Structures are given as structure tokens and as C-alpha cells.
């Protein structure tokens, strides 16, 4: 339990930031899931359209330190590679 007023304020602040980050992480995962579902169905056009939404979502999450920038780049790269394989 926080004792000082500054510690209590920090606890409130952390709770607010956690809620915001959780929301952003959920949105990011949803956009990635949409791409993966399109890839699984074999629909290249839908996958490309979903990827156009997922890539900025991943990069924004990395920029805001929700995920590591290398993890976001790796995810984008792997999704793009899987979409490219659909065309072959």
C-alpha cells in the first residue's frame, strides 16, 4: 500500500497508463489477427488490405513502448512474407 501522497498519485497514474496500454495492445492484436485470418483463408487481397491497417498499428505500438520495436518489425516482416507466399 502506498504511504506518501506522491506514491498514491503514482499508483493512480500507473493504473491509467495500464488501461490505455491494454486497450492499444488489444487493438494491435486484433489488427494482426485479421491479417492472419485472411492469410489462413488464402485471400491475398483481403490480407493486403488488412496488412495496410496492421502495419501502422504495430509501429504505433512500438513507438509508444507497448511492444519492442524489433518485435514489431519482426511481426510485420513475417506477415509480409506469408502474404507474399500467397501469390505463388
Swiss-Prot record:
Database matches in Gene3D superfamilies:
Ribosomal protein S20
GO molecular function of the protein, one example? structural constituent of ribosome
Q: Where is this region: Disordered?
A: 1-36
Q: Which Pfam families match?
A: Ribosomal_S20p (PF01649)
Key words of the record? Ribonucleoprotein, Ribosomal protein, RNA-binding, rRNA-binding
Identify one Gene Ontology CC term for this UniProt entry.
Answer: cytosol
GO aspect biological process, one term:
translation
| Domain of life per record | Bacteria
Q: Which InterPro entries is this protein grouped with? A: Ribosomal_bS20 (IPR002583), Ribosomal_bS20_sf (IPR036510)
The family classification in the record reads: Belongs to the bacterial ribosomal protein bS20 family.
**Chain's role:** Binds directly to 16S ribosomal RNA.
Q: What is this protein called?
A: Small ribosomal subunit protein bS20
Species annotation: Rhodopseudomonas palustris (strain HaA2)
